[in-house]
């Protein structure tokens, strides 16, 4: 399931649910079974109401947002290609995935630039008036 690698990135609340759905749908995506809740090593069965929660699985935050029926419906919607692409890009680079406000708050708290910047060298600005024009000297 993890393909021998570990990837992570900071996620805001809405992208947390996207990432959880993505992880729970991995066995389905790999054609290992038809429904996510059938995968024994996943939290999907608990989230879908097909199994009792284990002691290690904290459910309070999840229960505050979802019911088992809502989660089954959310899983049935599947991942959108745009969401999957954004999630993969962020996990490969380690950059945060969230709203601009979320990323700005992380930048303030870490004192680091976290949002991707434009590639390439900086554009040249207007010529500096203090530079000497060598063509006038000769």
Protein language model regions, located:
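Short Pro-Cys-Gly-centered "Cys-loop" motif that presents a nucleophilic cysteine in a tight turn
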Residues: 1-138
């Amino acid at each position: 399931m993890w393909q021998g690698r570990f990837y992570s990135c900071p996620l805001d609340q809405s992208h947390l649910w996207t990432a959880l759905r993505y992880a729970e749908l991995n066995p389905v995506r790999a054609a290992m079974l038809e429904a996510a809740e059938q995968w024994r090593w996943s939290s999907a069965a608990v989230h879908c109401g097909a199994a009792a929660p284990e002691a290690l699985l904290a459910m309070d935050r999840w229960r505050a947002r979802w019911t088992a029926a809502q989660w089954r419906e959310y899983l049935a919607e599947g991942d959108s290609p745009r969401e999957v692409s954004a999630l993969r890009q962020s996990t490969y680079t380690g950059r945060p995935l969230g709203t601009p406000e979320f990323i700005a708050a992380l930048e303030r708290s870490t004192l680091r630039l976290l949002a991707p910047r434009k590639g390439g060298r900086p554009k040249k600005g207007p010529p500096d008036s203090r530079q000497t024009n060598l063509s006038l000297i000769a």
